[in-house]
Amino acid sequence: MGQKSNPIGLRLKIVGTWDSLWYANRDYATKLHEDLLLRSFVKKTFHHAAVSKVVIARKVDAVIINIHSARPGVIIGKKGVDIDRIKQKIAKMVNHEVELHIVEVKKPDLKAVLIAENIAQQLEKRVSFRRAMKRGVQNCLKMGAKGVKVSCAGRLGGAEIARTEWYKEGSVPLHTFRANIDYSCVEAKTIYGIVGVKVWVYVGDSRAVVE
């Protein structure tokens, strides 16, 4: 039942890898909780910087954080002032030295999380859900995606009864393990209640598996 499982978790080590690159013999739960707090902090602090992914690695005496963003200039700030301030805040949270790296996302329209966040923002501004979905799908296909599917669930357009509507173009093979599928789920907080936005982006087969 490929449609019932998270496409990213299903393909770990086949197509992608984990976002937390460390191992711990003890205090594993504490470190994992720390990771969740760090991701939440980065997302909230740079909510306007189009952050697609936060990868965390750990050394014995340091925490290395790679922030993947479509707008790196917003994170760095003038002469790197903002990034130094954030470094100090994170260092206090984890009680370790912090290395912060900013990775630029070249094609933000191919990242499922950024597409979902963009659609959610439009829904919060009371844009028609059909228009928002169609625009997101078309922009993604223009950037070279082989297939995109977008689903919106909730009180769409202020309807009394919640329902799910979806829009799909191209191919999205959820049952093919070698298929490189990016997936994201975001909540839009509208005046009628929460609307769930899910996005699947198929960018092609993984070269490593094909070879």
Curated annotation (Swiss-Prot):
Leader sequence residues: none
Gene Ontology biological process terms, A to Z: translation
InterPro entries: KH_dom (IPR004087), KH_dom-like_a/b (IPR015946), KH_dom_type_2 (IPR004044), KH_sf_prok-type (IPR009019), Ribosomal_S3_C_sf (IPR036419), Ribosomal_uS3_bac-typ (IPR005704), Ribosomal_uS3_C (IPR001351), Ribosomal_uS3_CS (IPR018280)
Keyword annotations of the record: Ribonucleoprotein, Ribosomal protein, RNA-binding, rRNA-binding
SMART domains documented for this protein: KH (SM00322)
Pfam family, one: KH_2
UniProt record similarity statement: Belongs to the universal ribosomal protein uS3 family.
PANTHER family, sorted: 30S/40S RIBOSOMAL PROTEIN S3 (PTHR11760), SMALL RIBOSOMAL SUBUNIT PROTEIN US3C (PTHR11760:SF19)
Function comment: Binds the lower part of the 30S subunit head. Binds mRNA in the 70S ribosome, positioning it for translation.
Subunit structure comment from the entry: Part of the 30S ribosomal subunit. Forms a tight complex with proteins S10 and S14.
Protein name from the UniProt record: Small ribosomal subunit protein uS3
Source species of the chain: Anaplasma phagocytophilum (strain HZ)
Encoding gene (name): rpsC
